[in-house]
């Protein structure tokens, strides 16, 4: 089989589970060596081992607090020490919290920006010279609430909107430096984080988590919830030579749940 990413090196933040792990797995299936980053060393080690076993591609990892500058710098340094190269950056770290706005503490907004937004900005900047040298690509995992605000997801919506805006500006820089930049807007996707959201809403509404899931599918007119692999398939395509003319674009993977036309 012709593996379209053979020889490429990819850093995937949030790579120990969920969408990040699915992206790392699909990248490795296409021949890329992957470097996973998140805060939990045990999950990272397990994820890395699974990828190696299933794909026979090299997989390494680094545990760090990506909310802070030192964690991002350590991750970038560890990546370069291990592979001495970076072709692909997937910023997938960061699960922001939903909630009732008047009851949400300031720390939840600050934490959301620190992990999801600032880590993407910092790692993009730190690795930009390497990505420029290799005509690489950046894919940011954003989210539909960046374009469709919700009173129940104000923190995530604000963080995602900022990341989407940054992504477009970064794409303009990428035109100058030959770095492809795109971003993806997942809809409701089956992950541990989504299950936590369903359980929280269930407690608030005195329902079962599966009832909240059914209501979500029905209210958005979906056939089903998304799977992490749905997002990962698009991410891998956007990293491939076949997608090189797709640049500076946000694409939804939400089963048609977006209400707007863009």
Q: What feature does the model see in each segment?
A:
Residues 9, 16-18:
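Conserved glycine-rich cofactor-binding loop
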Residues 30-47:
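Conserved glycine-rich Rossmann-like NAD(P)H-binding loop of the short-chain dehydrogenase/reductase
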Residues 129, 172-173, 244:
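Alpha-helical segment proximal to the catalytic Tyr-Lys
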Residues 137-163, 167-176, 188-189:
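Catalytic loop of short-chain dehydrogenase/reductase
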């Amino acid at each position: 089989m012709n593996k379209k990413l053979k020889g490429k090196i990819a850093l995937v933040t949030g790579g120990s589970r969920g969408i990040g792990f699915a992206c790392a797995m699909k990248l490795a299936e296409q021949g890329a060596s992957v470097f996973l980053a998140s805060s939990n060393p045990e999950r990272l080690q397990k994820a890395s081992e699974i990828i190696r076993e299933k794909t026979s591609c090299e997989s390494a990892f680094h545990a760090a607090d990506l909310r802070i500058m030192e964690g991002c710098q350590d991750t970038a340094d560890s990546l370069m020490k291990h592979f001495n190269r970076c072709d692909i950056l997937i910023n997938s770290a960061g699960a922001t919290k939903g909630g009732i706005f008047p009851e949400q503490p300031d720390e939840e907004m600050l934490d959301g920006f620190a992990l999801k937004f600032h880590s993407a900005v910092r790692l993009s900047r730190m690795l930009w010279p390497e990505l420029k040298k290799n005509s690489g690509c950046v894919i940011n995992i954003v989210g539909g609430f960046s374009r469709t605000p919700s009173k129940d997801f104000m923190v995530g919506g604000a963080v995602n909107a900022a990341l989407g805006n940054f992504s477009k500006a970064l794409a303009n820089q990428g035109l100058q430096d030959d770095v492809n930049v795109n971003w993806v807007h997942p809809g409701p996707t089956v992950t541990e984080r989504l299950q936590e959201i369903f359980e929280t809403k269930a407690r608030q509404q005195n329902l079962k988590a599966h009832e909240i899931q059914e209501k979500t599918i029905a209210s958005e007119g979906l056939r089903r919830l998304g799977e992490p692999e749905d997002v990962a398939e698009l991410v891998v395509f956007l990293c491939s030579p076949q997608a090189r003319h797709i640049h500076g674009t946000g694409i939804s993977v939400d089963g048609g749940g977006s209400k707007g036309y863009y």
